[in-house]
């Protein structure tokens, strides 16, 4: 009878899991009419039916079989449990049912844990996040490694899941753990070219200077695999958020990480931890506050926003008008390049006064740009040394360069003073030179002044003559 119920199965071979292809599962379709248990089945047939119900994701049949006495931690071929399989296909509801029935969230087969299986599954990131959260809520250990010493966070980073990475860290996952090859989660993300994961790991305190056993750091790995944008990011980026999470309790981090809808029927949406204080200030200054929710939803940080290309702006739903504002702001931050080759050749004797004045004005403008650049650097540098993320060289090298800069500025000041004194000297000599010919403008001014005086004198004599004549006639 039971065998007849199973004849309706059309079985197609297939395997699951990341680390193991020998899980013994067959993927097939189970006819709904054959899913109802009409009698007591032998244990072997129950197990087979249980496997098929798990394969098709039939929650009701799984619950019936569990009610009939099948162990929730049944061991199938090659030692896989029902929860291990449900996690490998990111079936959220099936994982929930099995955990509610008491399935062991810390089960492992040859050091392949259920959490590792979930993080390396082929489901969507949304499904994986929900499954991982369920497992962590049942005290699954996020730091248990597989045989290759890879932890769940490494698998999540390797497969490009920044929200999963943040969720694991919020529950105590070690960010800088290394596998048997010396790879960290950041190294895996750099190797696979997952920019969003790299940015997230940097925020969470990942050390980008840890070397693999071959002596390579993440930026070098990114360059080797031709992920040049990530190479530049890891080579140049500062990380002011490093260590922020380590200073918080686990509960505080989880509160910032998880924003759960009060209605559990609405897909149990979880949002990953983000630190948007600097981003919100930047957007507010540009009048783009309306973009805050959009960027939060897409887990975009300020550093990510400032390194976006035009196609990434469009892909993330940023309008052309908003793009123009952001790009204009970035352009204003750039200091104008100093091009002294464009300045006039002041050494030529035939240079005009206007050209020389133009030279001085340009020189003054370039000095202003240099002052602005230094002011910007002073503003951006962290006040406290513990906020510096990059491995800096000895401070003595920086101070020595600054001392040279101060010396050069003093030399420049001295030379400008010499130039000013020279100009004053030339001006005085010119005024005292008897052979000096006045400029055309000066001659014209003197002639017009004399003409005015003559005209006034003639008018005065004429008026006086008129008065005298008038007086004589009256007499």
Swiss-Prot record:
- Provide the gene name from the record: ASZ1
Q: Which organism is it from?
A: Carollia perspicillata (Seba's short-tailed bat)
Enumerate the SMART domains for this protein. ANK (SM00248)
Q: Which UniProt keywords apply?
A: ANK repeat, Cytoplasm, Developmental protein, Differentiation, Meiosis, Phosphoprotein, Repeat, RNA-mediated gene silencing, Spermatogenesis
Write out the ranges of the repeats annotated as ANK.
45-74, 78-107, 110-144, 148-177, 181-210, 214-243
Entry-annotated residues carrying Phosphoserine: 17-18, 20
Q: Where does it reside?
A: Cytoplasm
Give the matching PROSITE patterns: ANK_REP_REGION, ANK_REPEAT
What top-level branch of life does the organism fall under?
Eukaryota
Provide the GO biological process annotations: cell differentiation; male meiotic nuclear division; regulatory ncRNA-mediated gene silencing; spermatogenesis; transposable element silencing
Residue intervals of the SAM domain: 272-334
The UniProt entry's GO CC annotations, sorted and at most eight, read: pi-body
For bias kind Low complexity, which ranges apply? 1-10
Q: What does this protein do?
A: Plays a central role during spermatogenesis by repressing transposable elements and preventing their mobilization, which is essential for the germline integrity. Acts via the piRNA metabolic process, which mediates the repression of transposable elements during meiosis by forming complexes composed of piRNAs and Piwi proteins and governs the methylation and subsequent repression of transposons. Its association with pi-bodies suggests a participation in the primary piRNAs metabolic process.
Official protein name in the record = Ankyrin repeat, SAM and basic leucine zipper domain-containing protein 1
Q: Where is this region: Disordered?
A: 1-24
InterPro entries reported for this sequence: Ankyrin_rpt, Ankyrin_rpt-contain_sf, Asz1_SAM, SAM, SAM/pointed_sf
Q: Partners and quaternary state?
A: Interacts with DDX4, PIWIL1, RANBP9 and TDRD1.
């Amino acid at each position: 009878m039971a065998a007849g119920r199973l004849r309706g199965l059309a079985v197609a071979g297939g395997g699951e899991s990341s680390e193991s292809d020998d899980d013994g599962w067959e993927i097939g379709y189970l006819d709904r009419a054959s899913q109802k248990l009409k009698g007591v089945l032998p244990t072997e047939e129950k197990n087979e039916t249980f496997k098929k119900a798990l394969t098709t994701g039939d929650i009701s049949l799984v619950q019936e079989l569990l009610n009939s006495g099948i162990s929730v931690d049944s061991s199938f071929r090659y030692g896989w449990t029902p929860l291990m399989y449900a996690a490998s296909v990111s079936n959220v509801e099936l994982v929930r049912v099995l955990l509610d029935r008491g399935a062991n969230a810390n089960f492992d087969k040859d050091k392949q844990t259920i959490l590792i299986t979930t993080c390396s599954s082929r489901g969507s990131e949304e499904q994986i996040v929900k499954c991982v959260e369920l497992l962590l809520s049942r005290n699954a250990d996020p730091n248990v490694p597989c045989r290759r010493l890879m932890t769940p966070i490494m698998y999540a980073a390797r497969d490009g899941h920044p929200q999963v990475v943040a969720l694991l860290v919020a529950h105590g996952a070690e960010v800088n753990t290394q596998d048997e090859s010396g790879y960290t989660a950041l190294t895996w993300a750099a190797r696979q070219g997952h920019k969003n994961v790299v940015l997230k790991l940097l925020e969470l305190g990942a050390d980008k200077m840890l070397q693999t056993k071959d002596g390579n750091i993440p930026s070098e790995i990114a360059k080797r695999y031709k992920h040049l944008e990530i190479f530049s990011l890891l080579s140049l980026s500062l990380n002011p958020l490093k260590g922020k999470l380590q200073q918080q309790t686990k509960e505080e981090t989880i509160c910032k990480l998880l924003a759960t809808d009060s209605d559990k029927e609405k897909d149990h949406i979880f949002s990953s931890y983000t630190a948007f204080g600097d981003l919100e200030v930047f957007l507010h200054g540009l009048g783009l506050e309306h973009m805050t929710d959009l960027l939060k939803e897409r887990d975009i940080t300020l550093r990510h926003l400032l390194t976006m290309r035009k196609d990434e702006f469009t892909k993330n739903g940023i309008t052309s008008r908003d793009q123009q504002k952001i790009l204009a702001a970035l352009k204003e931050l750039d200091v104008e390049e100093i091009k002294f080759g464009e300045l006039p050749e002041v050494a030529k004797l035939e240079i005009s006064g206007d050209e020389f004045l133009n030279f001085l004005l340009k020189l003054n403008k370039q000095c202003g740009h240099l002052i602005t650049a230094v002011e910007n650097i002073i503003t951006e540098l962290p006040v406290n040394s513990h906020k510096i993320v990059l491995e800096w060289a000895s401070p003595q090298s920086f101070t020595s360069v600054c001392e040279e800069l101060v010396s050069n500025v003093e030399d420049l000041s001295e030379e400008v003073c010499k130039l000013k004194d020279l100009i004053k000297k030339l001006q005085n000599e010119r005024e005292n030179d008897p052979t000096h010919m006045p400029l055309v403008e000066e001659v014209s001014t003197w002639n017009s002044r004399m003409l005015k005086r003559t005209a006034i004198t003639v008018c005065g004599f004429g008026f006086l003559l008129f008065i005298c004549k008038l007086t004589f006639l009256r007499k």
